[in-house]
Every structure is written in C-alpha cells, then in structure tokens.
C-alpha cells in the first residue's frame, strides 16, 4: 500500500468530544484508510499540514450491528489514527484538507 496518495490515506478528521480533549495534549484524531500503515499516516500528515509528527497510534473501531426496517445490517469498520504533534505545532481541523 505504499502507492496510496496522501489524500487517500487521510479520510477525514474525527471531531468528537474525546478528540477535542486530546487536542489539549497536542494530539489530532483522523479517520484513515483501513490499509494505511503508521509510516504512511505520518508522511501524509507531515506533507499535507506541514507539521512535525512525534507519534502515531492507531485503532480499528468495529462496525455496529444496526436494524433498518426490520432488516439487520452492519456498519463498516473504521480505522482511526491519533497523531501526536511536536511541541509548538498545531493543526486547525476546522479548515479541512
């Protein structure tokens, strides 16, 4: 998966209450492609936003079972990346990519 473009690696910023609290510790949370690796995520964030990344932590949130009109379906799995930035660096996720 080394041929993924930077915009294909980072799907969207994850704006939640928990990610807002993490921003106080110089961390930003992104939804990323399922097959993206930590080095690819680091390279994409550094290239797109022009910041220095100290660490990347990833997690996969399993999709929930949902019922719609009596039919049982399943939401897709989502991979998230918690990116820790260097001191003095920041990303304004409200501006978008």
UniProtKB/Swiss-Prot annotation:
GO terms for biological process: translation. This is Large ribosomal subunit protein uL23. The keyword Glycosyltransferase does not apply. InterPro entries: Nucleotide-bd_a/b_plait_sf (IPR012677), Ribosomal_uL23-like (IPR013025), Ribosomal_uL23/eL15/eS24_sf (IPR012678). It comes from the Bacteria. One of the early assembly proteins it binds 23S rRNA. One of the proteins that surrounds the polypeptide exit tunnel on the outside of the ribosome. Forms the main docking site for trigger factor binding to the ribosome. GO terms for molecular function: rRNA binding; structural constituent of ribosome. NCBIfam families: PRK05738.1-3, PRK05738.1-5, PRK05738.2-4. GO terms for cellular component: ribonucleoprotein complex; ribosome. Part of the 50S ribosomal subunit. Contacts protein L29, and trigger factor when it is bound to the ribosome. Belongs to the universal ribosomal protein uL23 family. Keywords: Ribonucleoprotein, Ribosomal protein, RNA-binding, rRNA-binding. The keyword Ribosomal protein applies.
